[in-house]
């Protein structure tokens, strides 16, 4: 395995610290917009960084920094099955769910992991065909019309983001065969809201838990079982699919469910949308064709991320820019704004992807580090956010870099002309206007009306939000997060930070440790049972 160094030990990072940001007011030109543009996957999904505060000097140092840190070589180690997740002694194999780029990866000296993931996909595709044809019906003999996925974190956020991104596209192309719903929160009101809004007789339920013992998912699964029984469905297991590890409690102890699809512990939840975790529901709702297009887009972007030239590798360049903005310019957050209603859930997935991966304060050697790591990821959809938090982005005291995402065409192809332009033209005009306004600003002697500009942004754009495009965009961000982790010398593939709260919650629920006056006082105020 290659050597890792802390970010502040890398010679080219020390050089980068002395480089001032580019002045966007004067730098942003038509020529720059044309030149500072690369494709994420090949030729249809673009990453434009013309409105980032960088120039050729930065790009040269980025290249040297990437080479010094062996970023592409480390990516190749991931693809070849090295145990990059050192704290858990695991490989990191989410790229294999959409195609093989590196060497054969053999687990436990016997199982080819690409073949394992492919066989699970084929099982999913065949199962979906049986559901769609009506060969498999509900326990009461009805054809399934709905799918509800029950899971939390990566078992919900990524799949939900992809589902909402593709739903209208599938509808327009007659590929929307079932309705999808999600239950994640342990709040029983969410379960009741979803289950009371559908006919459970016509609904297939997907239970996703890697360990088979996730607190929230177990509780929501029991809520579901109770609801099915109340609706006279005695053979409820015939309407439930399990997605879990082969050796989990759900797989070993819980028998008789309609079908089982298996995850692998080499893929963390936030990197699992292109595994059974995401593709089961997506195939059921939108067909095998859509699922394969998502995988194709992701795989093509994975390949492009192997390019050593930072000017031809969007995910690598985005990671280097992110490090510069966070660790040199001290920008503490990043805002994701998609000018597409279909992508309203996407920033929530990216929030988990980046903050759970790189929200660490120790390096790969379990040593405390003394530089900044992940930025706060947040966002929304345009143009809605222009009327909420854009005031702060334009004139607030914090500079917040932004990622804009936009598409030339709509998914449903319905529009209206108002004031001599279509709604979609207005949407795109607002996207372009915001990038320019944030970059160039506008001087005014009235300070209240002055726009300083110099607010950096990147633009991801394509002709249309298709399954292929969303697959490529998903891969772009996954690989960006991976490269950032390499530079920061942290393990992007564990999540110890989620454990402590779980332990204390279990203590409270079991009435343990009530010699702790803090637990007891909070519990008496909030939990009626105490």
UniProtKB/Swiss-Prot annotation:
**One GO BP annotation of this record:** gluconeogenesis
Query: Is Membrane a UniProt keyword of this protein?
Result: no
InterPro entries documented for this protein: G6P_Isomerase, G6P_Isomerase_C, Phosphoglucose_isomerase_CS, SIS_dom_sf, SIS_PGI_1, SIS_PGI_2
Which EC class does it fall in? isomerase
User: RNA-binding as a keyword?
Assistant: no
Q: What does this protein do?
A: Catalyzes the reversible isomerization of glucose-6-phosphate to fructose-6-phosphate.
**Protein name, per record:** Glucose-6-phosphate isomerase
